[in-house]
Amino acid sequence: MQKRIAFVIGMIFTLTLFTACRKRPSPPASATCDLGGGKTIRTNYSSPRMKGRRIYGDLVPFGQVWRAGANEATTFVTSSDVVVGGKTVPAGSYTIFTIPAADKWTLIINRKTGEWGIPYKYESDELARVDMNVSQLPAPVENFTIADDKSGSGCTLRMDWETTRASVDITAK
């Protein structure tokens, strides 16, 4: 009987270890920006791949909330108060979502954290909705990428995938 229990425990341990070590199809990634004076922002997300698929308007439908990545919802952490696209965001941890459209995107900054991502049911926890700038990239981007480009005293948070770039300016308050 003890051998059976030891065998079952060993199998559970092995399966748990195998699952934990398995490579995720959409690996974790992050973007950071130093706003100066010890003020920083950090965005943590999972980076899905295009894999020959049509993304916007198909895999990611226009006009619907998208978690801006894969797996867990994308997090946005700021060490101090910032201004995102004209809206004040107090220091803290947030979840960000987007609503993509062909010519206009909306960034949603949400107080609810620790969520998987979709379906979106957190309207009551929204801090702000911000318009994003949208432009076309000259060549397709295979891996969904969030980056913070330093610009003057702030950063431009950009999301690139397929042939689309959505961006918004962030400054320290």
Regions found by a protein language model. Give the residues of each.
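Bacterial N-terminal signal peptides that target proteins for export
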Residues: 1-9
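Hydrophobic h-region of N-terminal signal peptides that target proteins for export
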Residues: 11-19
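Targeting-peptide/extracellular-domain and disordered-appendage signature
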Residues: 18-90, 95-173
